[in-house]
């Protein structure tokens, strides 16, 4: 029987973890950290994502970087969990469980995130599953990275604050009013090319973290994209590279510490 400290990780592709390339220090998995995954298929049909969750049980597996086509892909929740454990916050007899609910390319504007929408409903289902596992389980943090999809849709930013605020208010009403919520800026390599529309959504998120209480915002302007880290042959400018994801997780943890130490 495990007693889990549960970390929610939700949003789109930078929360899913799409960064690759060289790193200063290789990530070493902890025997105390696990993922909660859902099996799904994601297809693009007429320019829109079609997400289908398999009717199979959720899976708990060791938390580690994914290998795709012989390349390691980072995930900022891993270094967040690493720092959480190093700081002595994981008490004896407890484990970390990361609820992996992010899917690339998703947004509020296309009715995937938000109260009653498919991804948020699946997130709630996964959260309930995690909390109801045998043992003493508790949610310790909600890590969010999203907004790129809503930045590129004309006028979508006008509803972004209300939809994100309502979603997080609903989550806290269900599971705890003081659950720390942490979000972050986009990859600057991509954001700088579409600055006006991106900054509107980023500033909304930044402001919301100041208003909602027990929340933090992580700045990322110095973090490299896959394109910047891996050379001109790589054109992926929207995703944090693997090294940046390692750093990002530590910054999320610093924001978390600032919240819990107030």
Predicted regions mapped to residue ranges:
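Cell-envelope and extracellular/periplasmic
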Residues: 1-262
